[in-house]
């Protein structure tokens, strides 16, 4: 879910064409959940193969990545590593929501309420090791690079943008700003939504809010993040006001006698000194066409005609570049 900063952060709408020739680091967890939630049958059932294995994520990776790359936008998927121990409560809470949603989904199906069933089905989406491994396998076959983060994928993606290995992070969450991403793109067509992309630039955001990056993190900790509850009754607007008035989170906590749900120094370091890997390779390769056909069509029952049509978009993307070396 991420920190709720929408009330104080103003994204700027852009066109897909504005991203032409750019490289974006895709928050894999965020994007795969979008695929699992949105690519479903009318009653909310995820796409599955003949053996009952979920394939919604594979469909999303193939068709939606193809649509983006056809527009000459290169993508790198960044996967989460081990979860920070302070995120345990958030993970448990989300698991409970998924379990309850799954119960409501099945109940709605039994009652024949398709609309309600689909609403709860979306909330019941869950990640598994099988989904993660099959996603990476497909990316390898497609020639799309991916990076395995040691910790938070958003932190790794943000680091890659800071290092110049990508132009922006593609994610629906605002957490990447806390991790220091210079640019975050929301509503990229990877989500499947017919919305114009939005871009948030960290430097201009801090300038508009008249705060530093550290103060932005402090404000988020007051509101609540995936790693702490925050202070009840403090939203983004009030949090911003308090940080501007007091200067930092320590003075706010002292004056309000508030508890943010953790040690502010430790919580700060999660965002300001995140665990990232400097050892990664980014290289685009030509798709292994027959390997993709074998994996998706033979093993998972995809339509060969549709898969081959999508693969032509990957091939077409490379032909629009000045030379093949620009991509592969």
Curated annotation (Swiss-Prot):
Top EC class of this enzyme: hydrolase
Protein keywords: DNA damage, DNA repair, DNA replication, Endonuclease, Exonuclease, Hydrolase, Magnesium, Metal-binding, Nuclease
Cofactor entry: Mg(2+)
Gene: fen
Biological function: Structure-specific nuclease with 5'-flap endonuclease and 5'-3' exonuclease activities involved in DNA replication and repair. During DNA replication, cleaves the 5'-overhanging flap structure that is generated by displacement synthesis when DNA polymerase encounters the 5'-end of a downstream Okazaki fragment. Binds the unpaired 3'-DNA end and kinks the DNA to facilitate 5' cleavage specificity. Cleaves one nucleotide into the double-stranded DNA from the junction in flap DNA, leaving a nick for ligation. Also involved in the base excision repair (BER) pathway.
Binding site for Mg(2+) 1: 27, 80, 152, 154
Record protein name field: Flap endonuclease 1
Residues annotated for Mg(2+) 2 binding in this entry: 173, 175, 226
Entries under PANTHER family matching the protein: FLAP ENDONUCLEASE 1, FLAP ENDONUCLEASE FAMILY MEMBER
Region (N-domain) location: 1-98
SUPFAM superfamilies listed in its UniProt record: 5' to 3' exonuclease, C-terminal subdomain, PIN domain-like
Keyword DNA repair tagged: yes
Organism lineage string: Archaea, Methanobacteriati, Methanobacteriota, Methanomada group, Methanobacteria
Disulfide bonds: none
GO molecular function: 5'-3' exonuclease activity; 5'-flap endonuclease activity; DNA binding; magnesium ion binding
HAMAP family to which the protein is assigned, alphabetical: Fen
GO BP term, pick one: DNA repair
EC number(s) stated in the UniProt entry for this protein: 3.1.-.-
Entry coiled-coil feature ranges: none
Subunit organization: Interacts with PCNA. PCNA stimulates the nuclease activity without altering cleavage specificity.
Chain positions covered by the region annotation Interaction with PCNA: 320-328
NCBIfam families: fen_arch (TIGR03674)
Region described as I-domain: spans on this chain: 116-247
Family affiliation: Belongs to the XPG/RAD2 endonuclease family. FEN1 subfamily.
């Amino acid at each position: 879910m991420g920190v709720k900063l929408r009330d104080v952060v103003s994204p700027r709408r852009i066109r897909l064409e504005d991203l032409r020739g750019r490289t974006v680091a895709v928050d894999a967890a965020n994007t795969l959940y979008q695929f699992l939630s949105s690519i479903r049958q009318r009653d909310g059932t995820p796409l599955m193969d003949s053996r009952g294995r979920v394939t919604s994520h594979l469909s999303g990776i193939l068709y939606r990545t193809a649509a983006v790359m056809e527009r000459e936008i290169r993508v790198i998927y960044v996967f989460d590593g081990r979860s920070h121990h302070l995120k345990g409560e958030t993970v448990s809470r989300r698991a409970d929501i998924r379990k309850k949603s799954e119960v409501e989904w099945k109940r709605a199906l039994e009652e024949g309420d398709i609309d309600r069933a689909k609403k709860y089905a979306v909330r019941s989406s869950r990640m598994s090791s099988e989904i993660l491994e099959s996603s990476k396998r497909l990316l390898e076959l497609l020639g799309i690079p991916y990076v395995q983060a040691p910790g938070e994928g958003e932190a790794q993606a943000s680091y890659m943008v800071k290092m110049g290995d990508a132009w922006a992070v593609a994610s629906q969450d605002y957490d990447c700003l806390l991790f220091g991403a210079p640019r975050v793109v929301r509503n990229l067509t990877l989500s499947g939504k017919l919305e114009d992309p939005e871009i948030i630039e960290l430097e201009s955001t801090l300038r508009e809010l008249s705060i530093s990056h550290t103060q932005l993190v402090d404000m988020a900790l007051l509101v609540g993040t995936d790693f702490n509850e925050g202070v009840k009754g403090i939203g983004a607007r009030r949090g911003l006001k308090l940080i501007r008035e007091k200067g930092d989170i320590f003075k706010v906590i002292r004056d309000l006698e508030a508890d943010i749900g953790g040690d502010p120094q430790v919580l700060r370091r999660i965002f300001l000194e995140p665990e990232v890997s400097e050892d990664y390779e980014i290289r685009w390769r030509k798709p292994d066409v027959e390997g993709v056909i074998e994996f998706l069509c033979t093993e998972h029952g995809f339509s060969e005609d549709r898969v081959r049509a999508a693969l032509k978009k990957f091939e077409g993307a490379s032909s629009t570049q000045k030379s093949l070396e620009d991509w592969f």
